[in-house]
From Swiss-Prot:
<keyword id="KW-1035">Host cytoplasm</keyword>
<dbReference type="GO" id="GO:0005524">
    <property type="term" value="F:ATP binding"/>
</dbReference>
<dbReference type="GO" id="GO:0003723">
    <property type="term" value="F:RNA binding"/>
</dbReference>
<keyword id="KW-0460">Magnesium</keyword>
<feature type="binding site">
    <location>
        <position position="233"/>
    </location>
    <ligand>
        <name>ATP</name>
    </ligand>
</feature>
<dbReference type="GO" id="GO:0019079">
    <property type="term" value="P:viral genome replication"/>
</dbReference>
<dbReference type="GO" id="GO:0030430">
    <property type="term" value="C:host cell cytoplasm"/>
</dbReference>
<comment type="function">
    <text>Participates in replication and packaging of the viral genome. Plays a crucial role, together with NSP5, in the formation of virus factories (viroplasms) which are large inclusions in the host cytoplasm where replication intermediates are assembled and viral RNA replication takes place. Displays ssRNA binding, NTPase, RNA triphosphatase (RTPase) and ATP-independent helix-unwinding activities. The unwinding activity may prepare and organize plus-strand RNAs for packaging and replication by removing interfering secondary structures.</text>
</comment>
<keyword id="KW-0378">Hydrolase</keyword>
<keyword id="KW-0067">ATP-binding</keyword>
<dbReference type="GO" id="GO:0046872">
    <property type="term" value="F:metal ion binding"/>
</dbReference>
<keyword id="KW-0694">RNA-binding</keyword>
<keyword id="KW-0547">Nucleotide-binding</keyword>
<dbReference type="GO" id="GO:0016817">
    <property type="term" value="F:hydrolase activity, acting on acid anhydrides"/>
</dbReference>
<feature type="region of interest" description="RNA-binding">
    <location>
        <begin position="212"/>
        <end position="247"/>
    </location>
</feature>
<protein>
    <recommendedName>
        <fullName>Non-structural protein 2</fullName>
        <ecNumber>3.6.4.-</ecNumber>
    </recommendedName>
</protein>
<feature type="binding site">
    <location>
        <begin position="227"/>
        <end position="229"/>
    </location>
    <ligand>
        <name>ATP</name>
    </ligand>
</feature>
Length: 297
């Protein structure tokens, strides 16, 4: 099992009058606008930049024939079949509608999606953790929605302020460490993850010597990964298999970039070896076995 994804289109769709909630009605899939048909034809072509086309489809007004009593139906290519708890769906939908329909920043958000967001798909776990923050009316997630959305969608590096719900558990000279508990059952999309930690550097591009020592101690020496988003993350032993498989889906250029990132040496020798093995096209089963064996010992 690899990381579960959700799409922004699972929550909201664009119409001529603005953004409205998404609905699911396969019977209406047959109705498409001319623009949607052209984009859907282009996404099927060999070598197509599917992520870019998905963003265009998301930012295109849907056919009026796909409106229902509850909202609008996104085209099949930009929605997922992921089961989303109603509590999470309601919280995230209302939050996104406030962001996208804002008179002052709405256009800026759409422009950012087109030019800066890598895709409209994102981690279901990240979305679940944003929903946890939304339950607290005093949380900054209600005022700083655009920036938190951008971090959730990996358009900008995250920090403590833009992460999903977490608790600061340690601060060193060079890092702040946060603990992420399993997501509450009523908000969790997919299977709950175990406890993990993230270390955020005090100064960008500077190694986290004391922070990593603290991270290893707090996490009981869990495997540490750098995903290239400006922080380090621990992975519980039982989740290494999924984590490595998910990381291996990155393209070669991205893995090389992360391998040479200033934070990667702090992640440790096992992480560097994993990157090297993936770049050398080792079988994924071999990579996982080596990482888990060394981690166990």
């Amino acid at each position: 099992m690899v990381s579960i994804k959700v799409s922004l289109a699972d929550f909201i769709v664009k119409t001529e009058e603005g953004w409205i909630p998404s609905d699911n009605c396969p019977a209406l899939d047959r109705f498409k606008t001319k623009t949607e048909k052209e984009l859907l034809d282009s996404i099927k072509k060999e070598g197509a930049d599917r992520a870019s086309i998905r963003k265009q489809l998301f930012l295109t007004s849907i056919s009026n024939k796909r409106l229902t009593q509850l909202g609008g139906v996104p085209v099949r290519d930009i929605r997922t079949s992921t089961t989303i708890p109603s509590s999470t769906r309601n919280l995230i939908t209302d939050w996104l509608l406030n962001i996208f329909n804002d008179e002052e920043s709405g256009e800026e958000v759409e422009s950012a999606i087109a030019s800066k967001y890598p895709d409209i798909f994102c981690s279901a776990d990240k979305i679940s953790r944003v929903a946890q923050r939304l339950e607290n009316r005093r949380d900054r997630v209600h005022e700083d929605g655009f920036r938190i959305l951008s971090a959730t969608m990996l358009a900008i590096d995250s920090d403590i302020a833009t992460e999903g719900k977490c608790e600061i558990v340690r601060a060193t000279e060079d890092a702040i460490i946060a603990k992420f508990e399993p997501v509450s059952e009523h908000l969790c999309i997919g299977n709950p993850r175990g406890v993990f930690y993230k270390a955020f550097p005090i100064k960008k591009e500077q190694p986290m010597v004391y922070g990593v020592k603290a991270l290893l101690g707090i996490s009981n020496r869990d495997f540490i990964m750098n995903h290239g988003h400006g922080h380090l993350r621990t992975v519980p032993y039982s989740e290494i298999n999924n984590a490595v498989r998910s990381f291996a889906k990155k393209n070669e250029a991205e893995i090389k970039r992360i391998r040479s990132d200033s934070l990667s040496p702090n992640a440790g020798e096992k992480f560097i070896n994993m990157c090297d093995m993936l770049l050398q096209k080792e079988k994924i089963e071999t990579v996982i076995a080596k990482i888990m064996k060394s981690d166990k010992n």
